[in-house]
């Protein structure tokens, strides 16, 4: 199919490119992993495994990591965990928030990521309402930030024709767009 051809093209990019695969825990991500497993990894794929702070999030991340290890030749270098919705960017704080990743010496934990990987690569992702909005809208924060729609102009046009409710809606989306840009520039790009 066309999607498999697109996936093949990504995998076969030259050495000057790295493919970043954000591996979620849904059916689509399982299908993508199954397809990549059929052809293998060529060393240019970086696997990002999202991880929330819940127990089930940890179990899903471990299962996903195990699938990727069967595909990836160099998992220590190419698997990276995104610690999603970190309440604070303070290292001590997110170390305790993500017990499913780091474990805790005083709390009994079944199995955590650090039980399977000696020094896992990771980065915390600060929680923000734009992340919640991105999930509801089915877009990444980056896509929301750099959407080319001029919501301000649309709001003015709607107001000029007397459609105040549409004008409010466009202002709402303009606000989200602005907040997403701020998040990308001031949080993600740091």
Model-derived regions, located:
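Walker A/P-loop NTP-binding active-site region of P-loop NTPases
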Residues: 1-13, 17-18
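Short, surface-exposed basic-aromatic patches at helix termini and helix-loop junctions that form
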Residues: 12-16, 34-43, 65-73, 99-103
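Switch II (G3) loop of P-loop NTPases
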Residues: 14-33
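Structural beta-sheet core signal
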Residues: 21, 47-49, 81-83
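Conserved Switch II/interswitch segment of TRAFAC-class P-loop GTPases
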Residues: 24-28, 44-62
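Residues at alpha-helix caps and immediate loop-helix transition turns in enzyme cores, especially N-
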Residues: 32, 60-61, 93-94
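Conserved C-terminal guanine-recognition region of P-loop GTPase G domains, centered on the G4
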Residues: 37-41, 55-90
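C-terminal lobe/tail of nucleotide-utilizing enzymes
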Residues: 78-80, 85-190
């Amino acid at each position: 199919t066309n999607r498999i051809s697109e996936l093949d093209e990504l995998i076969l990019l030259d050495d000057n490119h790295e493919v970043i695969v954000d591996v979620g825990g849904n059916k689509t991500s399982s299908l993508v992993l199954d397809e990549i497993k059929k052809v293998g990894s060529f060393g240019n794929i970086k696997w990002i495994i999202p991880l929330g702070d819940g127990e089930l999030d940890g179990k899903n991340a471990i299962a996903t990591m195990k699938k990727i290890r069967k595909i990836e030749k160099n998992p220590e270098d190419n698997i990276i965990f995104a610690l999603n919705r970190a309440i604070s960017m303070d290292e001590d704080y997110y170390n305790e928030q993500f017990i499913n990743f780091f474990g805790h010496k005083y709390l009994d934990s079944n199995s955590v990521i650090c039980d399977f990987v000696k020094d896992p690569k990771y980065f915390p992702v600060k929680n923000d309402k734009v992340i919640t909005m991105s999930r509801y809208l089915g877009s990444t924060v980056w896509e929301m930030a750099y959407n080319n729609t001029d919501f301000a102009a649309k709001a003015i046009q709607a107001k000029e024709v007397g459609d105040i409710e549409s004008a409010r809606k466009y202002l709402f989306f303009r606000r989200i767009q602005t907040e997403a840009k701020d998040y990308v520039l001031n949080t993600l790009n740091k």
